[in-house]
Each structure stands twice: as structure tokens, then as C-alpha cells.
Amino acid sequence: MKKLKKFVTKPHIFFRDALNNKYPIINNEQGIKELDERAVLSHQENLEKLESSLMNTPIPIDVVFTWVNDKDEKWQEKKQHYSKLANNYAFYAKDNVRFEEHNELFYSVKSVQKFLPWVRYIFIVTDNQIPHWLNNEDSQIKIVDHREIIDHDYLPTFNSHVIEANLHKIPNLSEHFIYFNDDVFVAKPLKKSHFFKPNGLASIFLSIKNLDKMYAKGTTTPTLLASMNSRRLLRKMYGQELNIQTPLIHSYIPLKKSVFEKIWSVFKEEIESFLSNRFRGKNDLNLATFFVPYAMYLEGKSVLTPEICYYFNIRSANAKAQYKKLLQKKENGNRPHSFCINDTSSSNNHFYHKNFNTFINLYF
């Protein structure tokens, strides 16, 4: 009777809902339908309140960013020099779009400071560069040079996997930290327990993608190859029957320094074998974004957690529609946890940078 009443009184809503049920809109990599987002968010918030009432352990949590300013002439000269010498690099490894900067870091850091006020320190790992907007009086933000955490034999490096493999060496880094790429933005206020439960368990945010299916389609990106290399070592450590098929979503990643150190102690030789790849290579391992999170899960130190992260390409034709949707959700109080505005070389749309800046200024 309710459906019949809706059909008679509000036919436009009836047909809209019918279409959404048959062809659901999905904005995230976990397969959560847009119609279900509010219910998922509400349920998760209720669980977090319950957990906080059970125990409230003061866990210090840091945030770590990796960042490069591709406009820096000295950095450009280094990249050009070593690019000519590189031979064992993977597809897209030297593509300029991988290093292109749209001032995302400023807004990503701003989103952390605005929506995660409980964060202790924000570390920015970079190659002898300092963001132009950084206020020296902001004691929360710490600049970490590559030389502080990476052996000089492997420098300079333009390989994100090499940089990420050494994050646990950041001086004064907390046991519990959250790794960010600068294209990931916190979209709303979030509690500590979204990342680390009061009992110390971390969250792991898995996608519904499939590694083997992507490989079968010929999607042999450096990230996919590194994930499959890491999976091989995980099976060696935890059992060949291990059926890991899904990567993590493109969002922030809760990590434990002690598990990083354990992986290094067990697979030191395998890790060091790819550190000389100045650009992403076919034998890379992606410790921060796959290996360590899965090791944490297999060690019983993390749990599967819903994460509604809107993920889209900054240059795509769909980007403006996603910007509009995120601003609407901000207004109606139905914001996702986060959003990732990825950059790939899918088009030469010259307006994408202007559209991004217009949106991001309105959102924050």
C-alpha cells in the first residue's frame, strides 16, 4: 500500500527510487549503495559511542603524509637526470601526472586539523621541500626529510613504495598512526575509534575489487604488481592457503609501527631488494598500503570496518557532478567519512584544476 500511495501522490519519487533500487548508485570502493549510506553511517556512529562508553584508553595517534612539490626546479632536475638512468621501472612509473600537485596537501592537512582534533602530530615526509603555506609556529606539523628515514644509498628516490617502506623510522612516531596520501580528505568529524578501537584494534578498510581479475584484464599497474608481490610473502608467512583477493580502498590507512618493524625483521632481504628502484618497479612491495595492513589483520590486530570514501578522478567528466553531490551532502548532514580525488592521465581537461579549487574552497 505504501508503494501504491507513493506512486499516486509522488510519482517522480516512486520512479526515482525504483531506478535507484534496480541500478544503485555507488560512490565508494566498498560497494555501499548511496541509498544505504545514511543507515551505515548511523549504525557505525552508534557502535562507536557504545565502544567509548565501555573503555576510553588514551591512545596517542599521529598522521603521516608523503608529499612532493613537482614545481620545484631542483627536484625536476633530479627527476629528469635519474629518469634517463632508470631501466627496471613499471608501467606509468615515470608519468608526470603521478607527481603533479594541485595544492591538495594544504586542504588535506586542513581536513585533519578540522575534523580530527585529537591527532597528536602531523608528519609530512618530503624530499628537502617545505610547503609554502606552512606556518612555522604550528608545532603540530613536523617536516621529515627523506634523509632522516631512508638510507643514503637509495636516495634520491621517486618511488612512493620505497618512501612508504620506511615510514616506521620517522623519529618520535607513535605506535598508532594513520597514513595519508595528499589526495585524501577527511569529510566530517570522526572519532579516534573509527581508526583505532579503544582496545587497540585498528580498522582495515577493504575494497570489493579483485587482484586476480584486475591482473587477468591486463591491469598491470605498479600498485597491482606490488600488491601481488606482497601477497606472495604474506602467504609465505601465514600459509599458502591464504586467499587474499582484495586491495584496500583509496583512503587513509591506520597502521601500527610494531607490525611494520616485524615485517622488516622477517623480510629484510626482500624489502631491501627493491629499495634501489628510484621509480616504481616490477619487484616492489607496498608495505604501507597492503603488506602491513594485511599482516595486522592476520595477527589479530585489526578488524574489517566500513569506510564510505567517495573516489573519483579529478580529470574525469564525472568530477563536477561528484563535487556538487559532496557539497549537497555537506548541507544536508549526510557526509561520507572521506573522499579521494585521484589524478590519472585520462584526459587533458584544462578546467579540472579550476573546478577542484572552486569545490575544495567551498567544502573547507
Curated annotation (Swiss-Prot):
Record keywords: Exopolysaccharide synthesis, Transferase
Broadest EC class assigned to this enzyme: transferase
E.C. number(s) listed in UniProt: 2.7.-.-
A Pfam family assignment: Stealth_CR1
InterPro entries per record: Stealth, Stealth_CR1, Stealth_CR2, Stealth_CR3
Disulfide bonds: none
Something else known: Stealth proteins are part of a protein family that is conserved from bacteria to higher eukaryotes. Family members were first identified in microbes as proteins that help pathogens to elude the host innate immune system. Microbial stealth proteins are involved in the biosynthesis of exopolysaccharides. Stealth proteins are predicted to function as hexose-1-phosphoryltransferases.
Function: Part of a group II capsule biosynthesis locus.
Protein name: Capsular polysaccharide phosphotransferase fcs1
Species for this entry: Haemophilus influenzae
Gene that this polypeptide is encoded by: fcs1
